[in-house]
């Protein structure tokens, strides 16, 4: 963590220098009474940026006396820049956070609780996964316009060819034994035997988001969630080792396509793709009448899946928290939620918007994703300031496991390093 901290400090000094030297730095309120609201967002897909920019314009027009200055920050650099701004005391009024990284900012004391700023009717309409993600130490600190979906996309024709059962919901998910048998049968009918895409071409947080549900489905986890003080005995227990041994076995058996061009499923090289909602549009275009969405396999304690995505919070240094809350409330109106969901394909963040959604409504092709979030199948990543250390260690462990290193040894080392980080930070005591 030392190298990260040094990087944040350097960026913070640069930000402080820029602020001190800028003679044109704007005040929060202009002479004509217009309130200037600073908003930071991640520079995601172009369609997302265009929708958010249009939302900012509509909000400013409706409010009349609020000028929203929207700044997009590259996604890869986002967390580092926000952390640097926090150290420099230069956070904007409103800003996004990537899912579980939220809790470290809360712990540092940078965010305001939202429960007294947002309408109660709006909060009660949020998906339970959204409020779970945004709640820390019994306070709501963030809300999301959308959430994510994680599952298995499949070609129905390939499954029919081997007589595979088609689960229609998480309760009917394939057992791990059944899934292993399906992989074997698919491989027998495939020339190169590669039948599963795990998006090994992805990087970073994908591996924690995409594969920690394997642990939870097996009865293990990344950390003991009772007090978030120990990974030992949880991340490296026998259930965790057995679960991730299955994953290593898939790779060793040659079932997993490395998918270097990110086109294995689209091109028909594999029958199954373990991925999130964002792949749907391309997959549907490639297989318009042959595409299925299925739950992840059950490793013994029920099918589990991931949750969490970008979410909005208000900085403690904001001079206009009520106006900031009005802006967030505007983004969470049904029409605006649907505009963003239609742009990025994600699960709408409110129940009202889900019901009006073409893809996620009762008869929508992606309804499984919404059901998983509303029915408790999805698992939030650990709600602890230690999460940056946890995910870094799990990502390292995943890479070692995929390359054949002993699973038990790898998980032992990861658990030890996570616990050492927690110890080094005095257990991450309650928010300052």
Language model regions located:
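A bilobed periplasmic-binding-protein/Venus flytrap-type ligand-binding module shared by bacterial periplasmic
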Residues: 153-156, 307-320
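Pocket-flanking alpha-helical
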Residues: 76-113, 123-142, 152-153, 158, ...
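Glycine-centered hinge/linker elements that transmit conformational signals in sensory
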Residues: 180-187, 220-258, 284, 296
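Extracytoplasmic/periplasmic solute-binding protein
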Residues: 137-145, 150, 177-229, 270
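Hinge/lid segment of periplasmic solute-binding proteins
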Residues: 97-151, 207-210, 214, 292-297, ...
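Conserved N-terminal structural module of periplasmic/extracytoplasmic solute-binding proteins
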Residues: 3-8, 13-104, 122-123, 260, ...
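Periplasmic-binding protein-like
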Residues: 51, 156, 191, 329-351
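Long, aromatic- and glycine/proline-rich binding clefts that accommodate carbohydrate-like moieties
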Residues: 291-294, 342-400, 424-432
